[in-house]
Amino acid sequence: MNTEYAELHCLSNFSFQRGASSARELFDRALRHGYAALAITDECTLAGIVRAWQASKDTGLPLIVGSEMHLENGPKIVLLVENLTGYQALCTLITVARRRAKKGEYRLLLEDFDHLPGGLLAIWLADIEGDAQACLAQGNWLRERFAERLWLGVELHRGADDEQRLADLLALAQSLAIPAVASGDVHMHARGRRALQDTITAIRHHTTVAEAGHLLFANGERHLRSLDALAEHYPDWLLAESLRIARRCTFTFDQLQYEYPHELVPKGQTSTSWLRELTERGIRRRWPRGLSVAARAQVEKELALITEKKFDSYFLTVHDIVEFARSQHILCQGRGSAANSAVCYALGITELNPEKSNLLFERFISKERDEPPDIDVDFEHDRREEVIQYIFRRYGRGRAALTAVASTYHGSGALRDVAKVLGLPPDQINALADAFSRWSDSLPSPERLREYGFDAETPILKRVLALTGELIGFPRHLSQHPGGFVISEHPLDTLVPVENAAMAERTIIQWDKDDLDLVGLLKVDILALGMLSALRRTFDLVHLHRGKQWTLASLPGDDRPTYEMISRADTIGVFQIESRAQMAMLPRLRPEKFYDLVIEVAIVRPGPIQGDMVHPYLRRRNKEEAITYPPKLKSVFERTLGVPLFQEQVMEVAIIAADYTPGEADQLRRAMAAWKRHGGLDPHRERLRTGMLANGYDADFADRIFEQIKGFGSYGFPESHAASFALLTYASCWLKCHEPAAFTCALINSWPMGFYSPDQLLQDARRHHIEIRPVDVRYSHWDCTLEPLDHPDSTRNLAIRLGLRMLRSFREEDALRIEAARSKRPFADATDLAQRAGLDSRAAEALADSGALRGLIGHRHRARWEVAGVEAQRPLFDDVTSEEVQVTLPLPTVAEDLVADYATLGTTLGPHPLALLRRQLAAKRFRSSQDLLSLENNRTLSVAGLVIGRQRPGTASGVTFVTLEDEFGMVNVVVWRDLAERQRKVLVGSQLLQVFGRLESNNGVRHLIAQRLYDLTPLLTGLEVRSRDFQ
């Protein structure tokens, strides 16, 4: 007799730190063994079920949806989904259990089962070793609620008492008149994962493997066993029962019906008619002179496709969210593929006119592609929460939630957890973690381990590294997506379980953002963008001080001084083109118009660089190489000089040259994005080549196009995305050029954001001759503000007054009390300030230490003395006076002020630290950033500077870019991979860095190619300078 079996109790690695195998591994192994079906029953979660469904579809092995659950003061059960009703009931049950507990836990109560609908089958995992009467009571309780849908699970794992255990379980089932079924309590796909299963068990219980004892399984039998092995353990009829259960479980995710909310539609309208009405209103606003024939045709095409795909309500919802933000004066802008849409532009969701941008709508929505659109909208980063809470209020927490992100184990984090439970001491764990690359999950080489004092051949180290390698990539927990919202017409917990997020007032669904497309859920991304906060604040400051009310749309376009500033790479603080790599590209590309900015935003990316597209484009732009492309592809290549730089261009080439449909072209884009991880490009190679040859293109051109597509990998940048970002790039550059004080002030008030610290932004402002005034309790507000200059130039220029937000650890509420008290009358002295503003000693000392009392009391030493003498107000002793002791305190030295400035403010308005060290550095023949401007190419030299940034972008093939700052400006340093590996401690740990290397100078771009690094941080004598690393 052939054994047949369906595994009904199996955990994947989405039972965090319990399951030791992925769904893909489990399905592959179950298929190999000849199982009839496989249930994934992760504990009180469906977080991994969509991936299990994908594995099921790929292998052809049926998936049974289920979940293992432990009831509080009740039985342990496995629930299996029989049909759609059962699936909805399971989602609701998990939601109830998760929402009443803190993040990462659940509480399932007996009363949760009192009114459970049908559609769920239950396998009872009875505790027959405990109280017999309690066990019978649990069985009766379950039988009353599940009746003919209850089985007793029989799980045998080669224990010494298996025979007796089987007899006891069968006797229990007989006494309760319920059927029994074989199940495996599977935790791994193969026996070889037992060591990892032991390891993650110890991690979960915060112990070591050596001390875990009975927390670990006695053997490795909780894997997917062969049918022959199962037949040795279980009677045939127990195995056959699993098939009867499996046949009852007919639910698939194709049965889910998802609807977007309808309540935004007024009476007398449908979602289709209301979307058209809003679109026509937007057209009259966006195109006051009327639409062109081509634009009208595009709008009609889009509206027809939106209706055909039943996306009308989705667009209405996004429009509603954007309108709310604008009603609250929150700056926002849609981006990404939505910028391809004329309807999105008309609705005010995006700011890019697709009629002028030649963008490809099929990149956004395609008739052939049965997938929902994905609209990303950026909001001011410090006001996005207002938008998020509006969505929760508008739709209710039952119908709106954020998507999850499955946070996974990475190199050093996995290493630390594994090494700890295997008993390594903390100092060795730290050293091992340091040996891991900061930039990848690959295990350290034997050579690198030796450098850090380890012998790679020792058994314990080999075991630690092997287990770390297995754990890397495993899901560790669910975190929340930065802003992806799922909103539904019906309760979300009938589609997917919902649980509490780590942040208060937020809830998340249990599915990762990448799972949504597979099940057809629509997501709108409510994203945070710091530059929008800075731009809005700049507009407000300009309006306050100049009377001008700028908007993104009203800023003058094609401004020559702005583009000249950009071409000089004078772009510290602006959007997207402020990194060292971008700044190195700017003098070579020399943008002159808006589309040049679109190119600039996109070209310094892994896709164009790895596809060898950057240098050909620059040569053609600089007329060093002929611009060539087939005449039929002029509409595709003319704007990028014959070099494909964008995903949309690849799609257009496939459509025009190889007869792809728009939907097929989008499939090519998706295959292109995923081929390095999953393959899938090979079918397109032959399809493209054959199609292009049939249409008269030569083989070399076809092969070159395909190689460039491969080069894009997963990094191809959408033109629509680049164009949307370029709008903000231009706006920030225009404001930096024409309103530098307001722009810098707004950047600091919006921090943390961007690439540079407030210190670096202020140093840049000073180099641009903007006056910076110190924090002063007599004038400063919480935010930095603008003040008129005292000289006649004041009609055009403004000074920045630093705000109390600059003081480290100073509270905003203290600042607001200071403002309120000062508005009534000026402060007389430290006592008056402390008493009227209600400041405690901590706040008063912070003001003194930072120099904020200099104008009221005097220098830091005197201010600190005065503050120390201020006593809290005591009404009982109001009439008692104490004699004041007069003390003369010395002025702080320049160096003391410098150290105190950085310690309390993170910046200084005094001399730059390097200015104080310049004589000492010059004696050692160190060059300054100013010197480098006049030195010839290939000169070897030494420089020293404060490390203000370290970058290792994916474009750079292991190169680290370091930015040093001295009193004159910045030095760009290139550190090749081998030097970075050899001197990692110096590279990563230095605050003041000496670099010996070779100067490269080309087209106005200067780099120092590092040959040796030295840590000069001790010269700073207590000065702490923070760099912005690896952004």
Swiss-Prot record:
One of its GO terms (molecular function) is DNA-directed DNA polymerase activity. Keywords: Cytoplasm, DNA damage, DNA repair, DNA replication, DNA-directed DNA polymerase, Nucleotidyltransferase, Transferase. Its EC number is 2.7.7.7. GO terms for cellular component: cytoplasm. Disulfide bonds: none annotated. It is found in: Cytoplasm. The keyword Cytoplasm applies. It catalyses: DNA(n) + a 2'-deoxyribonucleoside 5'-triphosphate = DNA(n+1) + diphosphate. GO terms for biological process: DNA repair; DNA replication. It comes from the Bacteria. DNA polymerase involved in damage-induced mutagenesis and translesion synthesis (TLS). It is not the major replicative DNA polymerase. Belongs to the DNA polymerase type-C family. DnaE2 subfamily. This is Error-prone DNA polymerase. It comes from Pseudomonas syringae pv. tomato (strain ATCC BAA-871 / DC3000). The gene is dnaE2.
